[in-house]
Design a protein with these regions (language model features):
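N-terminal beta-strand motif that seeds the catalytic metal site of vicinal oxygen chelate
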Residues: 1-19, 74, 123-164, 195-199, ...
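Vicinal oxygen chelate
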Residues: 16-19, 74-115, 157-162, 182, ...
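Conserved acetyl-CoA-binding loop of GNAT-fold acetyltransferases
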Residues: 28-34, 92-95, 168-175, 216-219
Length: 254
């Protein structure tokens, strides 16, 4: 699928309480709210480019995952290493702390139970466990991350070989790493639980016909104007392919 060069992947996470999760992503992770639209909240950095979306789904519509979640971990790479120290100076509740070649790194768990690793390394292998990070003086003008990307997602699947076939065809293996796990909720429809529901795949150029042909029966929907296409993987996670956007938008006219 080289004709459709991937720019980034944007996870869409279903959450029970958007406000509680919003506070976590802003305060603990230094992310910026870009757009609020109904149940959806778009998060990014100083570039105003969307990187993560939260979708509130109350308990009468969705429920807590039983067993392992589809989303094993989000790995976030930060552009300015020093800003990780600024976040650590806020004394977040970390589950792991590391020292890497470029600086510190840490892992946290969101109020919805999603694991997020924040680092600034070229190679994750450089990370070594760290007992305690030195506290630094935070500049008065630091309000959040200047730049970050979702480097990749780790996704739990019952059958990694089967799941990899689709991700290989879509050239997504660098952005979605499948991990073998067993659980009753791993193959439910994406609206049932508070979990990873959608992966938006932003493409530099979007040749919808070429992509539809390569993905075949996995394609569930193509917008009538060809502006986006929806595929479902073996875990019923939606893959939402679209061309690179000049502005943030988190919903569409069908």
């Amino acid at each position: 699928m080289t004709i459709n060069q991937i720019v980034r992947v944007i996870p869409v996470l279903k959450v029970n309480n958007r406000n509680v999760n919003q506070d976590f992503y802003e305060e603990t992770l230094g992310m910026k709210v870009l757009v609020e639209e109904g149940a959806l909240l778009s998060l990014g950095d100083a570039s105003n480019v969307e990187k993560i979306v939260l979708e509130e789904s109350p308990s009468m519509r969705s429920r807590k995952v039983e067993g392992p979640k589809k989303l094993k971990r989000i790995v976030v790479k930060v552009g300015e290493t020093q800003e990780i120290d600024y976040l650590l100076a806020r004394k977040p509740q970390t589950t792991a702390l590391y020292q890497g070649a470029n600086g510190r790194a840490f892992e946290v768990v969101s109020p919805q139970g999603d694991r997020i690793l924040v680092h600034a390394e070229e190679e994750l292998e450089s990370l070594e466990p760290l007992e305690e990070a030195p506290l630094v003086v935070v500049p008065d003008d630091f309000t959040g991350l200047t730049a970050f990307e979702v480097a990749f997602l780790e996704v739990n699947v019952p059958d990694p070989a089967q799941a990899k076939k689709l991700y290989e065809t879509a050239d997504l293996t660098g952005f979605v790493h499948v991990k073998e796990a067993q659980g009753e909720d791993l193959q439910l429809e994406n609206n049932v639980t508070w979990d990873l529901s959608t992966i938006k795949v932003e493409l530099a150029a979007f040749d919808v016909e070429a992509l539809r042909e390569s993905l075949g029966d996995a394609v569930e929907f193509v917008h009538r104007k060809g502006s986006f296409m929806i595929v479902k993987d073996t875990s019923r996670i939606e893959l939402w392919f679209e061309g690179k956007q000049g502005r943030v938008h988190i919903s569409y006219e069908s």
